[in-house]
Amino acid sequence: MQILRIAQLMALLATCASALPTSTGSRVYSRDVDQTQGGFSGSPTTNSPDSVAETGRLEARSGGSSSTETEKERKKRIKAEQNARIRQEEINRKPYQCPYCSDPTVFSHSDALGRHIYTIHRGMPIYNAKDPRKTAIPYNPPGRSTSIFGSEPF
């Protein structure tokens, strides 16, 4: 029990002694933040040979964060490339696209595209994405006339 108390007292004294200002400055560090304070001379601690920056622990922490930033950038780039590739494969699988939307919406068959154009774009012509000159069969909803201005039940 006494050995434990002596060890605690020595740890407390070591902590207090490292926090006192010296001629090269104070060495008060937390786990995450470098809290150097100027001592009597006002010089920073990083100039002293026994500072945390000289031992390499500070560089290891800062080096880890910069490498994770590059890792994040690399992951974002890979994800963007995969999304572009998936989008192109989706366009290749689904031949019909809406020419009226700003982001070309693609559909696997003309019926789905017809429903989209009829409800959103009010019956404009439908085009095939692989052959834009070819017009698909227009979508006629059940119970509706072919003209959008015709007699429609309300």
From Swiss-Prot:
Residues 35-50 have a biased composition (Polar residues). Residues 69-85 have a biased composition (Basic and acidic residues). Keywords: Host nucleus, Metal-binding, Secreted, Signal, Transcription, Transcription regulation, Virulence, Zinc, Zinc-finger. Residues 1-19 form the signal peptide. Probable secreted effector that translocates into the nuclei of host cells to reprogram the expression of targeted genes by binding on effector binding elements in rice. It is found in: Secreted; Host nucleus. Coiled coil: none annotated. The lineage of its organism: Eukaryota, Fungi, Dikarya, Ascomycota, Pezizomycotina. It comes from Pyricularia oryzae (strain 70-15 / ATCC MYA-4617 / FGSC 8958) (Rice blast fungus). GO terms for cellular component: extracellular region; host cell nucleus. The gene is HTR5. Its main location: secreted. A zinc finger (C2H2-type) spans 96-121. Residues 24-85 are annotated as: Disordered. Induction: Expressed during multiple stages of host plant infection, including the prepenetration, early biotrophy, late biotrophy, transition and necrotrophy. The keyword Metal-binding applies. This is Host transcription reprogramming factor 5. GO terms for molecular function: zinc ion binding.
